């Protein structure tokens, strides 16, 4: 059974650092092997790919653009009347992913080429794999039940289009249910059951489920049953403690050592994204001592740093976030 692999969500972690490249460097120096970025569109994608490459990080996930944040938009995939804007945003994400895919090698001196520059392939550090296709919110003032069918129809149409676009670069599109009890009361896609039903209707193999354990616990609980039921559809996992959306080491409802073991036992092979609000900056607050080899890793003020496929230390417990 392979140990879990962790990715740093640099839109959440290292908040004391002002730029995404700086956060990527911090993630690399903290022992992460991968990173994900919510909305990378304020930075040149080549710069992000180059930084990730320099510190040995694989970039695994970005989101489609949120739309007009000033008007309260948080994704456009299921929003009636915004189909063209969703497709424009998908194109923007796809173009960004193309840049991240292109920066696959670094120049090095080729000793046998009389000073000419050669290339060493490092695609494993830069290849973007997944794009979260954000569903968006129920329109302001609309009744959720009244617009549900229309929004699902729009979402299905957009997802079929997205699947075709993403297939051109062998990318996977992800659907993430976001809880409507605490985080986003108007978000359209809010349970794994709803997302799984939509995936079945779309019927595209490169569309999968994004399991954020924080949201799933808030909406439905029953994490053991839901993980076992839906894991075959899952392409990516994210974690945070409930209800405070802190790191797995903070007080809360979730028993993360158990959940991480469950994911391993069920054969999950993807990354576990650390998407939480860190308690502090810098410095390790705890390290495994002698005889704790089965729980290899580090725990810091920011939570779990897994340089060797960390399963969080036995005393940890989790919290929530989007």
Enumerate the language-model features and the residues they cover:
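Short, conserved active-site loops that position catalytic residues or coordinate cofactors/metal ions
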Residues: 26, 30, 61-72, 134-136
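Aromatic- and glycine-enriched glycan-recognition loops and surfaces
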Residues: 21, 40-42, 88
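A short beta-strand-loop structural module common to alpha/beta enzyme folds
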Residues: 32-42
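Active-site-proximal loop/turn and secondary-structure-junction residues that shape catalytic pockets
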Residues: 12-14, 39-41, 65-68, 135-139, ...
């Amino acid at each position: 059974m392979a140990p879990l692999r962790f990715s740093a969500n640099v839109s959440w972690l290292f908040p004391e650092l002002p730029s995404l490249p700086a956060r990527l460097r911090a993630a690399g120096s903290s022992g992460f092997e991968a990173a994900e970025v919510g909305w990378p569109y304020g930075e040149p994608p080549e710069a992000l790919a180059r930084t990730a490459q320099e510190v040995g990080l694989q970039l695994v996930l970005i989101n489609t653009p949120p739309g007009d944040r000033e008007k309260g938009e948080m994704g456009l995939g299921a929003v009636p009347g915004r189909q063209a804007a969703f497709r424009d945003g998908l194109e923007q994400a796809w173009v960004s992913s193309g840049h991240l895919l292109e920066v696959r090698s670094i120049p090095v001196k080729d000793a046998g080429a009389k000073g000419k520059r050669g290339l060493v392939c490092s695609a494993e550090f830069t290849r973007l794999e997944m794009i979260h296709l954000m569903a968006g919110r129920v329109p302001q003032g609309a009744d959720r039940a009244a617009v549900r069918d229309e929004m699902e129809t729009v979402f299905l149409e957009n997802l079929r289009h997205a699947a075709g676009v993403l297939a051109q670069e062998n990318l996977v599109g992800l659907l993430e249910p976001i809880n409507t009890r605490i985080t986003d009361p108007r978000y359209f896609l809010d349970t794994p059951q709803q997302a799984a039903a939509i995936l079945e209707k779309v019927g595209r193999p490169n569309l999968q489920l994004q399991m954020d354990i924080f949201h799933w616990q808030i909406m439905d609980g029953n994490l053991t049953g839901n993980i076992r039921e839906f894991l075959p559809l899952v392409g990516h996992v994210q974690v945070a403690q409930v209800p405070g959306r802190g790191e797995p080491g903070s007080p809360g409802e979730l028993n993360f050592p158990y959940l991480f073991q469950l994911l391993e036992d069920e054969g999950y092979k993807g990354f576990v994204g650390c998407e939480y609000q860190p308690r502090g900056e810098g410095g390790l607050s705890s390290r495994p001592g002698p005889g704790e080899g089965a729980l290899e890793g580090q725990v810091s003020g920011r939570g779990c740093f897994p340089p060797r496929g960390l399963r969080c230390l036995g005393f940890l417990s989790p919290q929530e976030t989007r």
